[in-house]
Amino acid sequence: MARGLKKHLKRLNAPKHWMLDKLGGAFAPKPSSGPHKSRECLPLVLIIRNRLKYALTYREVISILMQRHIQVDGKVRTDKTYPAGFMDVVSIPKTNENFRLLYDTKGRFRLHSIKDEEAKFKLCKVRSIQFGQKGIPYLNTYDGRTIRYPDPLIKPNDTIKLDLEENKIVEFIKFDVGNVVMVTGGRNRGRVGVIKNREKHKGSFETIHIQDSTGHEFATRLGNVYTIGKGTKPWVSLPKGKGIKLTIIEEARKRLSAQQA
């Protein structure tokens, strides 16, 4: 008889973008239930131990968390396997550091260091807009938030700029041709570009055609696209490379020039 969720995760079955060693042990941290899907998140233990190197062992991570040093989106989190995900702000007040979880062009999570001003907000993609009791409108975001009385102009797939201190919508970006987006799924995950065209297919997925700043065009599904700014200017700072995917030859040339320098 089943007794709830599985509490274990084998290391070989863990998502590739966690970048865990095969020989580092048999098991990996199983993400807790939370705002992000288990295959699209990064547990806090991996952020503190594997990425930031503030701990050497699992036990040290628990000690740091229990001292209430780690905040995600402005709230203290003590769960070692809390699932942090795309666009989340991880803050460490003790060291005056703030990081935003973004993707690199290889589809892996990148902890991008940000300033205090930028850590006060996050961009949330709108999943749906519904009406509750007595006709009260509310919207649902990609990270499980419910916000009542949104602007009537906000529609699904738009992006809202959310003030993390007051939990209020400051501004919003329409999902329109000409706006800058980041791809959050599929083989183009982590790439940044401007929407060029939107193909609608009845009874199937909508296809979005995107062009990056170097002029390369690619296409992906509507569900994989996340608006991050109006026009060509993103509202959040981007990691090194600015979401431009290099070919294998370009990468090799870049490595050679770095070695020679």
From Swiss-Prot:
Keywords: Cytoplasm, Ribonucleoprotein, Ribosomal protein, RNA-binding, rRNA-binding. It is found in: Cytoplasm. One of its GO terms (molecular function) is mRNA binding. This is Small ribosomal subunit protein eS4z. InterPro entries: KOW (IPR005824), Rib_uL2_dom2 (IPR014722), Ribosomal_eS4 (IPR000876), Ribosomal_eS4_C (IPR032277), Ribosomal_eS4_central_region (IPR013845), Ribosomal_eS4_central_sf (IPR038237), Ribosomal_eS4_KOW (IPR041982), Ribosomal_eS4_N (IPR013843). GO terms for cellular component: cytosolic small ribosomal subunit; mitochondrion; plant-type vacuole. Belongs to the eukaryotic ribosomal protein eS4 family. It comes from the Eukaryota.
